[in-house]
Every structure is written in structure tokens, then in C-alpha cells.
């Protein structure tokens, strides 16, 4: 695990991978091009891969990124620990925050998905010292996560961002057309999937997104 400084700046342009969308260009090639374009953190997410396949991908991606930006994994905290990744992101229905932190250790990144003010308040009350950031959303409807909750919209995002004590990352349906509006709500960063993974030129896509900040 690399000792990345856990600054909110690392959340500025947060790439969540989608193996299917990256298939033509290659997952690793897409990620490296996106980092060249300004991506500041990468989350490996593949809901369909086996744990063995995901571990292999995690190790290959970690070697390719070579510490340039933090690499975290979605949900699979044990794989993050085993592959010595920089951390993990978990949802409301996954492993508890306390369990995840115990597995990952103090130095790792740990983020949690938040969809409502009640969830945020509960997080402040119970997990404030265990988390590094919260993911707020979905902001807009998105095709890359079929089971997502009701979109919170820009107004909901603004409310949650202002209420959060922790650094915030907005996620869900964010692209070049709305990135500036999302950044203007006060969140520390935006998380994107298809806006980069489905782009013909991931480097240029990342450059265009970070320019909206």
C-alpha cells in the first residue's frame, strides 16, 4: 500500500471502472490514459467478476498505476487488503464501516455511499473518525448502476455537500455537460464511469472533465 496523503484534492476527478465499457480499449489502457488526463483516484468496480479474477485485475492495475494515484476497490475489502491496494469504497448494504476499517487498517482510504440526510447524520454520529470521504448520489439517473436509489439532483447534492463534515464526492450520471454544475454545489470531487470509460479518448475526456472544476 502506498502512503498517499489522504487529501480531499485526491477526490477531484474520481474514476470508477467498468470492464464492459472499457473492453475495446482495455481496462488498464483506459485507466492509464485517464490518469494522464487528470484523474486523481481510481476505484476498481466489477460486480460480475469472481473474487479470484478481481484479485488478479487489482494486482495488475496496481502494478500499472505504480503509485501515481490512489487505487481503491468497490465493496471487496478483503481483496483490497490482500492485494495491498490503497483502500476501498463500501455501500450502505455492505460490510460495516467499523469492520472495513479494521480489515484495511488506519492508513487506507475508506469511503461510504450516502443517499439521504439521515444516512449522513448517522455517519457523522457513528463513523466520523473511521471514514475519509462520503460518496453522494446518485445525482442523476445512470445506466451503469441498475439498482441505484432515487436520484438526489443538484439541489439534494448541494444540501448534502454543505451538511457533510467529511470530504464529498458526487456520483451518478455525471458527464461533460453537467460536471461544472455538479462542482458548483460545493462537493470536493466528481466520480464518473461512462464519461471516461466509454469515451473514444479517455485522456481527453478526463482533461475536459477536470477543466470544469
UniProtKB/Swiss-Prot annotation:
Cofactor note: Binds 1 Mg(2+) ion per subunit.
Alphabetized UniProt keyword annotations: Magnesium, Metal-binding, Thiamine biosynthesis, Transferase
Associated pathway: Cofactor biosynthesis; thiamine diphosphate biosynthesis; thiamine phosphate from 4-amino-2-methyl-5-diphosphomethylpyrimidine and 4-methyl-5-(2-phosphoethyl)-thiazole: step 1/1
Segments passing through the bilayer: none
Catalytic activity: 2-[(2R,5Z)-2-carboxy-4-methylthiazol-5(2H)-ylidene]ethyl phosphate + 4-amino-2-methyl-5-(diphosphooxymethyl)pyrimidine + 2 H(+) = thiamine phosphate + CO2 + diphosphate; 2-(2-carboxy-4-methylthiazol-5-yl)ethyl phosphate + 4-amino-2-methyl-5-(diphosphooxymethyl)pyrimidine + 2 H(+) = thiamine phosphate + CO2 + diphosphate; 4-methyl-5-(2-phosphooxyethyl)-thiazole + 4-amino-2-methyl-5-(diphosphooxymethyl)pyrimidine + H(+) = thiamine phosphate + diphosphate
Binding site for 2-[(2R,5Z)-2-carboxy-4-methylthiazol-5(2H)-ylidene]ethyl phosphate: 142-144, 173, 193-194
Example GO BP: thiamine biosynthetic process
Cofactor: Mg(2+)
GO function term, MF aspect, one: thiamine-phosphate diphosphorylase activity
Gene3D superfamilies the record matches: Aldolase class I (3.20.20.70)
InterPro entries in the record: Aldolase_TIM (IPR013785), ThiamineP_synth_sf (IPR036206), ThiamineP_synth_TenI (IPR022998), TMP_synthase (IPR034291)
Residues bound to 4-amino-2-methyl-5-(diphosphooxymethyl)pyrimidine: 43-47, 74, 113, 145
Binding locations of Mg(2+): 75, 94
CDD domains: TMP_TenI
GO cellular component: cytoplasm
EC annotation from Swiss-Prot or TrEMBL: 2.5.1.3
UniProt keyword annotation of Magnesium present: yes
NCBIfam families reported in the protein's UniProt record: thiE
HAMAP family in the record: TMP_synthase
Family to which this protein belongs: Belongs to the thiamine-phosphate synthase family.
Annotated function: Condenses 4-methyl-5-(beta-hydroxyethyl)thiazole monophosphate (THZ-P) and 2-methyl-4-amino-5-hydroxymethyl pyrimidine pyrophosphate (HMP-PP) to form thiamine monophosphate (TMP).
Name used for this protein in its record: Thiamine-phosphate synthase
Amino acid at each position: 500500500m502506498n502512503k498517499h496523503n489522504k487529501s480531499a484534492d485526491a477526490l477531484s476527478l474520481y474514476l470508477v471502472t467498468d470492464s464492459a465499457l472499457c473492453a475495446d480499449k482495455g481496462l488498464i489502457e483506459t485507466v492509464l490514459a485517464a490518469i494522464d488526463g487528470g484523474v486523481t483516484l481510481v476505484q476498481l468496480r466489477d460486480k460480475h467478476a469472481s473474487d479470484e479474477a478481481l484479485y488478479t485485475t487489482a494486482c495488475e492495475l496496481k502494478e500499472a498505476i505504480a503509485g501515481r494515484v490512489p487505487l481503491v476497490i468497490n465493496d471487496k475489502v478483503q481483496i483490497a487488503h490482500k492485494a495491498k491496494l490503497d483502500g476501498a469504497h463500501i455501500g450502505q448494504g455492505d460490510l460495516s464501516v467499523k469492520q472495513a476499517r479494521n480489515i484495511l487498517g488506519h492508513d487506507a482510504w475508506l469511503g461510504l455511499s450516502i443517499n439521504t440526510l439521515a444516512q449522513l447524520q448517522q455517519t457523522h454520529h457513528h463513523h466520523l473518525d473511521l471514514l475519509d470521504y462520503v460518496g453522494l448520489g446518485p445525482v442523476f439517473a445512470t445506466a451503469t448502476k441498475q439498482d441505484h436509489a432515487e436520484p438526489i439532483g443538484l439541489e439534494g447534492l448541494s444540501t448534502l455537500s454543505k451538511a457533510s463534515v467529511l470530504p464529498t464526492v458526487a456520483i451518478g450520471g455525471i458527464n461533460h455537460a453537467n460536471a461544472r454544475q455538479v462542482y458548483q454545489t460545493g462537493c470536493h470531487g466528481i466520480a464518473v464511469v461512462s464519461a471516461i470509460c466509454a469515451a473514444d479518448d479517455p485522456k481527453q475526456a478526463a482533461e475536459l472533465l477536470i477543466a470544469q472544476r
